């Protein structure tokens, strides 16, 4: 199963540098904290619509080439993050199989739990970068995060109903 928002997410084109944008946009696009937490701070009930969770081969995660270690299998999770039932964000997480050892194995079992609820409670979380992307009228971003030094790639597309617009 797929979703049109995930097709748009995969079509994001990234800027070489942070573009000169309105402060409101940059505030959302460069947020270092959890989007789940940000949505909840707006008084919204946050839920996850799980689109896909599975191991996939390299050919299904080409956007990770050069950003993650080259491996034969990756854990792929695709979701819609909803605020009061309305989709505000499409998310795609690519996790190399080698990252899934020790406590990070929980990444395979999040189900309908928002990723941010796990990531941003970890004292071992670091972020290597945030890149801003755009597809037509929609904005997105991707980040390489590390848990205990082990990488994963998180891509987020802000959907039309989100407060970014």
From Swiss-Prot:
Cross-referenced Pfam families: Chor_lyase
Pathway where it operates: Cofactor biosynthesis; ubiquinone biosynthesis
SUPFAM superfamilies in alphabetical order: Chorismate lyase-like
Location of the protein in the cell: Cytoplasm
Predominant location: cytoplasm
Residue numbers binding substrate: 35, 77, 115, 156
MF terms (GO), sorted A to Z: chorismate lyase activity
KW Glycoprotein (keyword) present: no
EC number: 4.1.3.40
One GO biological process term: ubiquinone biosynthetic process
Catalytic activity: chorismate = 4-hydroxybenzoate + pyruvate
Keywords: Cytoplasm, Lyase, Pyruvate, Ubiquinone biosynthesis
GO CC annotations on file: cytosol
Similarity annotation: Belongs to the UbiC family.
PANTHER family (alphabetical): CHORISMATE PYRUVATE-LYASE (PTHR38683:SF1)
Quaternary structure, from the entry: Monomer.
Entry function: Removes the pyruvyl group from chorismate, with concomitant aromatization of the ring, to provide 4-hydroxybenzoate (4HB) for the ubiquinone pathway.
HAMAP family assigned: UbiC
Official protein name in the record: Chorismate pyruvate-lyase
Species, as recorded: Salmonella schwarzengrund (strain CVM19633)
Species lineage: Bacteria, Pseudomonadati, Pseudomonadota, Gammaproteobacteria, Enterobacterales
């Amino acid at each position: 199963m797929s979703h049109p928002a995930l097709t748009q997410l995969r079509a994001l084109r990234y800027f070489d540098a942070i573009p000169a944008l309105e402060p409101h946009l940059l505030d959302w696009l460069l947020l270092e904290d959890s989007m789940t937490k940000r949505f909840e701070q707006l008084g919204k009930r946050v839920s996850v619509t799980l689109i896909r969770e599975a191991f996939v081969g390299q050919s299904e995660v080409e956007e990770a080439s050069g950003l993650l270690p080259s491996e034969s299998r990756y854990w792929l999770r695709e979701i819609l993050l909803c605020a009061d039932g309305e989709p505000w964000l499409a998310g795609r997480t690519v996790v190399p199989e080698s990252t899934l050892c020790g406590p990070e194995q929980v990444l395979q079992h999040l189900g309908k739990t928002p990723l941010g609820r796990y990531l941003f409670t970890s004292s071992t979380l670091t972020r290597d970068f945030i890149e801003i992307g755009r597809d037509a009228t929609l904005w997105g971003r991707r980040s390489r995060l590390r848990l205990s030094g082990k990488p994963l790639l998180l891509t987020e597309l802000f959907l039309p109903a989100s407060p970014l617009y």
